[in-house]
């Protein structure tokens, strides 16, 4: 699980540290935020203390109406030993009870000028991205006509050479050899290259080349959503390959099923063109145009008409 600490969100969103400085290295383990409205009323039975706490105008205006004794109790209960941070929006004034409780328990109190809903949305998106489940796959990720194509297959089958040809044809390289994948949403997989090999491509007999240096900034991308997987495998005599395009394979990556095509490799086949056409055909299918289904439907009509004539 990737690690995010309180100081990371401080730096990302330029938050002002008000108190509790000793806790800025506390880990944030969940992307959900908490707006402790019911807790301000004194109900802490289901208080999600492991979440970042966000205080807006509603929570603070209610807090100001509480008796002084209760105010101190509420803030002491709010600042636990595992609470990553308490953030105030709209540059609201920090209650002195909160400053005292945060210093005593080492809970960072931060302040932002953003509106509560805006801050909540940006924080959630940032944390979901950073805390998303991740994995790494041996393959090549290329952006082909806006479609994120993940090329997989045994070592030496020609993935990198195919990627180089695609780059020459105007498409963009995301990652070669090792693709780091994170699941940002239920059906959203985003791939990127490890920092060490970003923009690099290994070609056997040629060595390592820097795609951005050779072809320019327009030939690379830092990350791309994975839309389809293409498995390159050496052509096996006698093996049946899909010739109509009606059968749809799936490959499970983390918790997401991604459409998968198996493309046999043999001398004379232009893989780059095949992958381009596969990407365009995939886009057409998503727009409701399926050539294989249309052909099958027409064929069935012809067979039915011939049967009636007889």
Curated annotation (Swiss-Prot):
Residues forming the catalytic site: 138, 159, 177, 243
Example of a GO MF term: protein serine/threonine kinase activity
Top-level taxon: Bacteria
Residues at which ATP binds: 153-160
Residue numbers spanned by region Important for the catalytic mechanism of both phosphorylation and dephosphorylation: 201-210
Biological processes annotated in GO: regulation of carbohydrate metabolic process
ATP-binding in keyword set: yes
Binding of Mg(2+), residues: 160, 202
The protein's required cofactors: Mg(2+)
Keywords: ATP-binding, Carbohydrate metabolism, Kinase, Magnesium, Metal-binding, Multifunctional enzyme, Nucleotide-binding, Serine/threonine-protein kinase, Transferase
Residues passing through the membrane, by range: none
EC code: 2.7.11.-, 2.7.4.-
InterPro entries according to UniProt: HPr(Ser)_kin/Pase, Hpr_kin/Pase_C, Hpr_kin/Pase_Hpr_N, P-loop_NTPase, Ser_kin/Pase_Hpr-like_N_sf
Protein family per UniProt: Belongs to the HPrK/P family.
Quaternary state and interactors: Homohexamer.
Miscellaneous note of the record: Both phosphorylation and phosphorolysis are carried out by the same active site and suggest a common mechanism for both reactions.
UniProt domain comment: The Walker A ATP-binding motif also binds Pi and PPi.
Role of this protein: Catalyzes the ATP- as well as the pyrophosphate-dependent phosphorylation of a specific serine residue in HPr, a phosphocarrier protein of the phosphoenolpyruvate-dependent sugar phosphotransferase system (PTS). HprK/P also catalyzes the pyrophosphate-producing, inorganic phosphate-dependent dephosphorylation (phosphorolysis) of seryl-phosphorylated HPr (P-Ser-HPr).
Protein's recorded name: HPr kinase/phosphorylase
Organism: Bacillus pumilus (strain SAFR-032)
């Amino acid at each position: 699980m990737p690690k995010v600490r309180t100081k990371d969100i401080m730096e990302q969103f330029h938050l002002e540290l008000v108190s509790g400085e000793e806790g800025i290295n506390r880990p944030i383990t969940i992307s959900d935020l908490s707006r402790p409205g019911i807790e301000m009323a004194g109900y802490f039975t289901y208080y999600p203390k492991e979440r970042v706490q966000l205080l807006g105008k509603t929570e603070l205006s209610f807090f100001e109406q509480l008796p002084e004794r209760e105010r101190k109790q509420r803030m002491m209960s709010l600042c636990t030993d595992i609470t990553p941070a308490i953030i105030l929006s709209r540059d609201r004034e920090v209650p002195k009870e909160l400053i005292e409780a945060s210093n005593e328990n080492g809970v960072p109190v931060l302040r932002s000028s953003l509106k509560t809903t805006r801050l909540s949305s940006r924080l959630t998106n940032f944390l979901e991205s950073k805390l998303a489940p991740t994995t790494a796959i041996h393959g090549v990720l290329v952006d082909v006509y806006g479609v994120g194509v993940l090329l997989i297959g045994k070592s030496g089958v020609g993935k990198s050479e195919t990627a180089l040809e695609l780059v020459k044809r105007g498409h963009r390289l995301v990652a070669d050899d090792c693709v780091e994948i994170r699941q940002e949403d239920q059906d959203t997989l985003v791939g990127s290259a490890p920092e060490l090999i970003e923009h690099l491509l290994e070609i056997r007999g040629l060595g390592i080349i820097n795609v951005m240096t050779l072809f320019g900034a327009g030939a690379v991308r830092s990350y791309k959503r994975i839309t389809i997987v293409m498995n390159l495998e050496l052509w096996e005599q006698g093996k049946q390959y899909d010739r109509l395009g009606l059968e749809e394979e799936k490959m499970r990556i983390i918790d997401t099923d991604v459409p998968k095509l198996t493309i046999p490799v043999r001398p004379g086949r232009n893989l780059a063109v095949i992958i381009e056409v596969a990407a365009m055909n995939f886009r057409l299918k998503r727009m409701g145009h399926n050539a294989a289904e249309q052909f099958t439907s027409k064929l069935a009509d012809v067979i039915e008409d011939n049967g009636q004539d007889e």
